[in-house]
Amino acid sequence: MQMMNATKQLMNAKDHAGHTTDNQEKQFLEQKSPNERILKSIYDLYERGPNGNQPGSVGILEIAKDPLLVVQCWKPRKKVSVLIIGNHSAGKSSFINWYIDESIQTTGVAIETRGFTYVTSGRKRESLKGDATFAFYDHLDGLEKFEGIQANVFTEVSTSKEKNFPAIDFIDTPGLVDGEMEYPFDVSAAILWLADHVDLILVFFDPIGQALCGRTMKVIEALNVKHAEKLSYYMSKADQVEKEHDRQRVLIQITQNLSGRINNSHAFKLPTIYLPNEHNANANIPNALSEVCEDIDKAIRLTVQKNLTAMKDDCARIDRKVVEVLEEDRTKRAENVKRSMRGAALLALSWVFIFFMTFVAFVELFAFRFVGNFVRKTIMPRCNDFFAAILM
C-alpha cells in the first residue's frame, strides 16, 4: 500500500512537473529563461531525441545503449542542484523560503530539519515522501544504502517562479550539532555522498554560539578534499550581531578555524548575509545576499556549459563508435566476400577433379579394348608404312 501511494504521488508530481502534451510544453518553455530552456532541451535530447514525443524519435541515451555501440553516457539533470549545509539555526530553511518567496520549509531556533528535503519547482504544490522522492530523482539510488535515511528524505514541490528557482533544486540538510544529538542516519556520510551529485554547496555559519560547531567543521574539511570548487561560505543572520567589532570578532574566529581545513585559503571569502525584514530595514550592516544569488546564477551558467560540453563529448564518442562499428562491418564483409570466393573456387576445382577422376575410371573400365584395337589396326599400319617409306 505504501509503495502504491508513493507511485501515485510520483505520477501526480510528474504530471505537474513537466510531462505534458507538446503544445502545453511549448507554451511552458516560452515562459522559461534561456538557461532553463537550454537545460530542458539538453535533457530532452538525451531522453526523447530531437523530435520529442514524435514516433521514431530516439534519445541519445537509447542510441548509446544500442547493443552494437554500448557507449557509456549519463543523462544530465535539467536543473541545478544546490546543497545548503550548516549548523542548526543557521538560516538554511529561511533562505530557501526567502529565495522562492514562499514559506515552504519550517523554520525556528529548534532543530526543525532532521532529514534531507528537496525543494523544487513544479506546476502544483505537492509533498513527496521517501519512496516517491527516490523514484522522482533517479540519481539518488546510492543514497538508499544509508540505513534509516529513506524515511528522512522528502520533496516539496512549489509553484514559485521567483528569481531562477524554476532551474534549481534546493537540498535542505539537517542542522549539524555537537554533543549527544543523535540522527536516525549517518548525516555526515550522507552529506558527503550528496556532494558528489550537486553543482553548488552553500555553507551557512550562525554567528550566535554555533559557528564553530565541530561536526560542521569536520564535514567542511571532508568536502574540501573533493569539492573545494563547489563550496561558498557565508555568515548568516549578521543582523543579529549589532556591533561591528562583534561581527568582526566572529568572522575572525570562523576564518581562523577554517584556515587549516580548507583548500585555497588565500582566496577565502566569508561575506555576511541576513534576510531583509521590517526590523532590519535601516540596519547599516553589509548584506551579501546578492552574492549568494550570483553564486547560484553562476552555477546555472556553468551547468549549462558543462551539460553542453558533456553532450558534445557524448555525441562525439557515439559518432566515433559508429564509424568504428561501420569500419569493422566493412572489414568483416570484405573477409566474407573473400571467403565466399575462395569457397566457390574450391567447389569448382572439386567438381573438375571429380569429373576428371570419373572420366579416367570410365576409360579404364570400358574403353581399354577399343583403344587397343584402334591402335593395332589403324595407328600401327600407318606407322609401318611411314617407316618403310623412309627406309626405301
Q: Where is each model-derived feature located?
A:
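Conserved beta-strand elements of beta-rich interaction domains across eukaryotes
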Residues: 89-90, 123-125, 175-176, 208-210, ...
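Amphipathic alpha-helical protein-protein interaction segments
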Residues: 28-32, 71, 75, 88, ...
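Amphipathic alpha-helical interaction motifs in eukaryotic regulatory proteins
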Residues: 43, 96-100, 120, 192-196, ...
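Beta-strand cores of modular interaction/reader domains in eukaryotic scaffold and signaling proteins
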Residues: 81-83, 117-120, 169, 203, ...
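Conserved C-terminal guanine-recognition region of P-loop GTPase G domains, centered on the G4
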Residues: 141-266
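Interhelical loop segments of eukaryotic multi-pass membrane proteins
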Residues: 363-391
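C-terminal end of P-loop GTPase domains and the immediately downstream helical coupling element
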Residues: 228-370
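Conserved G1/Walker A P-loop phosphate-binding module
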Residues: 2-173
